[in-house]
Amino acid sequence: MGLGQGGGLAQRGTFAEGLKNDVVVVALSPGRRHLTKPVCEITYGIRESGIQTSVQVLNAGSGLPADAPNSLGSTFGLKPEEVEQVNRHKLCIIHFGNVKSHVVYKARLFLRFVTILTIVVCQTPIDMEDFAKIGIKTADVIPIEPKTKGTIVEIVTGVVRGESSPQSKIDEIIEKIKKHLK
């Protein structure tokens, strides 16, 4: 386990469990390009709204999955214990970043193992069809050949990594969480 730049907020491999296993917010490994700042603010906002929330910062959350096109450098992956920790919850919120191709391939690897409903938060404009094209199950678009166990139920775009999240985005995330926790 190494230390990464997290804006002083979190380090890779961190897992902080809430009192109830309702929601888990997942952040990529902190580093030069993946700062956990928006994830920490989102988590704080969710907790302030009265929803029990856990936090998981992935140990190998930077880079691309090995099966992604043009995958060079560091490799995105999940440890079995991270998968187990996430799957104990009812709903997952994960922030994937800004590069569209990275977002979809990371989501596919993540949801191969994570079986719970997932809300994707990212900076780049993206829709359910972008995920379904590579086999990710979504609430709105069913892929021809599903390659994931988990399902994307909502997408929130425009959340910039390393920057403060506008209250409107935090409110949007909370609204979508409440819709799926009923």
Swiss-Prot record:
The keyword Acetylation does not apply. Pfam families: MCR_C. InterPro entries: Me_CoM_Rdtase_prot-C, Me_CoM_Rdtase_prot-C-like. The keyword S-adenosyl-L-methionine does not apply. GO terms for biological process: methanogenesis. It comes from the Archaea. Keywords: Methanogenesis. MCR is composed of three subunits: alpha, beta, and gamma. The function of proteins C and D is not known. This is Methyl-coenzyme M reductase operon protein C. The gene is mcrC.
